[in-house]
């Protein structure tokens, strides 16, 4: 195991040295990220090697690295399944007319009209607020 990890390190180091000079800056950033990930993988591979040495501080059950890596994947898959995509339903205008029973008993359609005198709230109904304040002061 130790020789395999050391071989992986030299391979990564060779990749870094060979690609640093010939790759544009944006690709260099990607390579740095990959090299950092490789370093983390090397550190993780070294941890079980150190824990294999017998000693008073060793645990009876070492944590399995594979099961720890699988758990985030399971959470991501389950969260993807729970996402509900909203559906947009396109409809057209309705041809229905509302019929209300009034005291007069007529079935004719009515238009809702705004009262002409709004009192102190009139200034909010005008298109220009400056005109609303001027007309309020004159009254």
UniProtKB/Swiss-Prot annotation:
It comes from Homo sapiens. This is Spermatogenesis-associated protein 33. The modification Phosphoserine is found at residue 94. Residues 68-139 are annotated as: Interaction with VDAC2. InterPro entries: DUF4609. Residues 97-109 have a biased composition (Polar residues). Keywords: Autophagy, Cytoplasm, Mitochondrion, Nucleus, Phosphoprotein. Interacts (via PQIIIT motif) with PPP3R1, PPP3R2, PPP3CA, PPP3CB and PPP3CC. Interacts with VDAC2. Interacts with ATG16L1 (via WD repeats). GO terms for biological process: mitophagy. Residues 1-83, 97-139 are annotated as: Disordered. It is found in: Cytoplasm, Cytosol; Nucleus; Cytoplasm; Mitochondrion. Plays an important role in sperm motility and male fertility. Required for sperm midpiece flexibility and for the localization of sperm calcineurin to the mitochondria. Promotes mitophagy as well as acts as an autophagy mediator in male germline cells. Links damaged mitochondria to autophagosomes via its binding to the outer mitochondrial membrane protein VDAC2, as well as to key autophagy machinery component ATG16L1. The keyword RNA-binding does not apply. A motif (PQIIIT) lies at residues 86-91. GO terms for cellular component: cytoplasm; cytosol; mitochondrion; nucleus; sperm midpiece; sperm mitochondrial sheath. Residues 25-50, 110-120 have a biased composition (Basic and acidic residues). It comes from the Eukaryota. Residues 1-67 are annotated as: Interaction with ATG16L1.
